[in-house]
UniProtKB/Swiss-Prot annotation:
Post-translational modification (record): Truncated SEPHS2 proteins produced by failed UGA/Sec decoding are ubiquitinated by the CRL2(KLHDC3) complex, which recognizes the glycine (Gly) at the C-terminus of truncated SEPHS2 proteins.
Gene Ontology BP terms: selenium compound metabolic process; selenocysteine biosynthetic process; selenocysteine metabolic process
InterPro entries found in the cross-reference section: PurM-like_C_dom (IPR010918), PurM-like_C_sf (IPR036676), PurM-like_N (IPR016188), PurM-like_N_sf (IPR036921), SPS/SelD (IPR004536)
Protein name: Selenide, water dikinase 2
Substrates-to-products reaction catalysed: hydrogenselenide + ATP + H2O = selenophosphate + AMP + phosphate + 2 H(+)
Binding site for Mg(2+): 120, 161, 316
Pfam hit, one: AIRS_C
Record organism: Homo sapiens
Cofactor requirements of the protein: Mg(2+)
A single cellular component GO annotation: cytoplasm
Length: 448
């Protein structure tokens, strides 16, 4: 499993990254305004070189389907922490109290919640000091061509599971890296340090550090990691307290998987011919760049604002799509509620591409996302203020939020209405002509 320190191949890759400054010599930080598109020939590689050519799947699209996944992992659930009736508190509060070192019979203790298989992160009460260990792991395959941005996206995706719990600090990260055996030695030496640097830069932006990991050789490139934090109960928000009347807020647009696939189709005439009537090459390039920037943006700001605006529950939107993750979150609720989604903020033109291609299921909410936004249950009176606050320049550029649905009385399910309102989200650098007439109202109430 994970090495204790940055040694071996992982250490060599990180050491090589020390001398690398990212694409075009830039350190992007919280702004992508100075980003220049990746050109493989700048590294001495062929102009036709593609990072995505070293895997057969892309990003979070590699996930095992949710229902099958839960069956596969059923044997890992410990008898003393099995989820009762699909609730979010694992094993009951008394068992959680005993795990935390309290005497048997001490009674329910909301101070020591626990969370296991089925949600974004595990929450394990520690034996000492009323603290909890919150930990998550994630990895996937390349879905963009820029190695540096791929590293940033992978790190942002790992940290996002902590941010979905309202956690803003991470104590430590490990990096998991697989170098493709199909790569030449020259390709490995030039590309791998950029991926490592992107991962490390995103970790540093998140206020943490990569202290070790594991690196192997594999047919496909893989990158991801482990994020760990020890915190007090008031530092995280359990994903189980939505109430009737809450609204659902989404902090990144959908359509990332569609955008990265459409970008690859520019070099595939058979696929491109199916969608070229609904989107131009320029629009695909802009959508791809916007998807890349969004995936590389940390959800840390949204996590902090969850506390400010009294969030009741949240999850991040990744491989199961907005519908799958909404359904999973709904199952965790203590109250008898259901989620109804009315609005779908989507990167401009990607809804049309999804429909024309006959793939993805973007409008049905089943299209995979990678390093997507947080879906947050907020009190109705707080939601519009959240959407306004997150766009403040003090948090840097690129943060957005939309009210996309409501929480109503129900049986812990989630659904998207038959004809959801599509909000076309204008990519940075696009002309106003791409913008749909109603897409500027970021905090509009869902319609029935």
């Amino acid at each position: 499993m994970a090495e204790a320190s940055a040694t071996g191949a992982c250490g060599e890759a990180m050491a090589a990254a020390e001398g690398s400054s990212g694409p075009a010599g830039l350190t992007l930080g919280r702004s992508f305004s100075n980003y220049r598109p990746f050109e493989p020939q700048a590294l001495g590689l062929s102009p036709s070189w593609r990072l995505t050519g070293f895997s057969g799947m892309k990003g979070u699209g590699c996930k095992v389907p949710q229902e099958a996944l839960l069956k596969l992992l059923a044997g890992l659930t410990r008898p003393d922490v099995r989820p009762p009736l699909g609730r979010g508190l694992v094993g009951g509060q008394e068992e959680a109290s005993q795990e935390a070192g309290l005497p048997a019979g001490a009674g329910p203790s909301p101070t020591f919640p626990a969370l296991g298989i089925g949600m974004d992160s595990c929450v394990i009460p520690l034996r000492h000091g009323g603290l909890s260990l919150v930990q998550t792991t994630d990895f996937f395959y390349p879905l963009v061509e820029d190695p540096y941005m791929m590293g940033r996206i992978a790190c942002a995706n790992v940290l996002s599971d902590l941010y979905a719990m309202g956690i803003t600090e991470c104590d430590n990260m490990l990096m998991l890296l697989s170098v493709s055996q199909s790569m030449s030695e020259e390709e490995r030496e030039k590309v791998t340090p950029l991926m490592v640097k992107g991962f490390r830069d995103a970790a540093e932006e998140g206020g943490t550090a990569v202290t070790g990991g594991q690196t192997v050789v594999n047919p496909w490139i893989i990158i991801g990691g482990v994020a760990t934090v020890v915190c007090q109960p008031n530092e995280f928000i359990m994903p189980d307290s939505a109430v009737v009347g809450d609204v659902l807020v989404l902090t990144k647009p959908l359509g990332t998987q569609v955008a990265v696939n459409a970008h690859q189709w520019l070099d595939n005439p058979e696929r491109w011919n199916k969608v070229k009537m609904v989107v131009s090459r320029e629009e695909v390039e802009l959508a791809y760049q916007e998807a890349m920037f969004n995936m590389a943006t940390l959800n840390r700001t949204a996590a902090g604002l969850m506390h400010t605006f009294n969030a009741h529950a949240a999850t991040d939107i990744t491989g199961f799509g907005i519908l799958g993750h909404s359904q999973n979150l709904a199952k965790q609720q203590r109250n008898e509620v259901s989620f109804v989604i009315h609005n779908l903020p989507i990167i401009a033109k990607m809804a049309a591409v999804s429909k024309a291609s006959g793939r993805f299921g973007l409008l049905q909410g089943t299209s995979a996302e990678t390093s997507g936004g947080l879906l947050i249950c907020l009190p109705r009176e707080q939601a519009a203020r959240f959407c306004s606050e997150i766009k403040s320049s003090k948090y840097g550029e690129g943060h957005q939020a939309w009210i996309v649905g409501i929480v109503e009385k129900g049986n812990r399910t989630a659904r998207i209405i038959d004809k959801p309102r599509v909000i076309e989200v204008l990519p940075r650098g696009a002309t106003a002509a791409v913008l749909a007439p109603d897409s500027s109202n970021a905090s509009s109430e869902p319609s029935s």
